[in-house]
């Protein structure tokens, strides 16, 4: 699949990029039953298609988030409920967009190179 991944043309908007990727992701994951394998591939596709600094997931384990598959620099392994952007999004049950992490109270700097987050 990686060799045949079709990406949007240079300058395409986010919506168009997602529309092109969605059927490919469905095809990529339709015959695979392993959650980790599918999550890992979806993350790799998103990183390649959008060039994000970091793409990954955390899994809820008791009262903390535990790092799952990701692409990018080293990440925090565990994040407590209600802490940082990820823990706050989990606690509040909502998506959080942070344009400037320095402006987010309690931001956890897993990487000093990260300047924004979408959780």
Question: Where are the model-predicted features located?
Answer:
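A short, aliphatic-rich beta-strand micro-motif
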Residues: 115-119
